[in-house]
């Protein structure tokens, strides 16, 4: 036992993320992105820089991802990035298990600006407005980017983890 040498511990296997089929297709066609670990259901997740979102979103639409199932925001915590998330589905006739991919765009908290995908998927309309209203993510090129849930004069972004609730809410009687 004393004669045995200590062997270096190999790097963690999870450090290398295998590329899924969509990521491979994007790479083959020259689109800059990063593969992230798949979610618990096996849905492929890719990270895209804000400047490359529109070209990649357009390419994914042309590749068959014709349905934006979900668009939302994530706050990674005070002082950390905000994330704009897009869950895309390839809908086709007689598809038992449609192909899915999730696109994440990490944005700086101080200036969270990303292009709108409204012109690619019309379902992004109210979803981008909700992400703007709750997280303050600005979707450039959106035709009607204004608050959708909170009053127009509301101050702050209620779903940010560093949001401080006002001490006083003015309630009016219904009669």
From Swiss-Prot:
NDH-1 shuttles electrons from an unknown electron donor, via FMN and iron-sulfur (Fe-S) centers, to quinones in the respiratory and/or the photosynthetic chain. The immediate electron acceptor for the enzyme in this species is believed to be plastoquinone. Couples the redox reaction to proton translocation, and thus conserves the redox energy in a proton gradient. Cyanobacterial NDH-1 also plays a role in inorganic carbon-concentration. Keywords: Membrane, NAD, NADP, Plastoquinone, Quinone, Thylakoid, Translocase, Transport. PROSITE patterns: COMPLEX1_30K. It is an enzyme of class 7 (translocase). GO terms for cellular component: plasma membrane-derived thylakoid membrane. InterPro entries: NADH_DH_suC, NADH_quin_OxRdtase_su_C/D-like, NADH_UbQ_OxRdtase_30kDa_su, NADH_UbQ_OxRdtase_CS. NDH-1 can be composed of about 15 different subunits; different subcomplexes with different compositions have been identified which probably have different functions. It is found in: Cellular thylakoid membrane. It catalyses: a plastoquinone + NADH + (n+1) H(+)(in) = a plastoquinol + NAD(+) + n H(+)(out); a plastoquinone + NADPH + (n+1) H(+)(in) = a plastoquinol + NADP(+) + n H(+)(out). The gene is ndhJ. Signal peptide: none annotated. PANTHER family: NADH DEHYDROGENASE [UBIQUINONE] IRON-SULFUR PROTEIN 3, MITOCHONDRIAL, NADH DEHYDROGENASE UBIQUINONE IRON-SULFUR PROTEIN 3. It comes from Trichormus variabilis (strain ATCC 29413 / PCC 7937). This is NAD(P)H-quinone oxidoreductase subunit J.
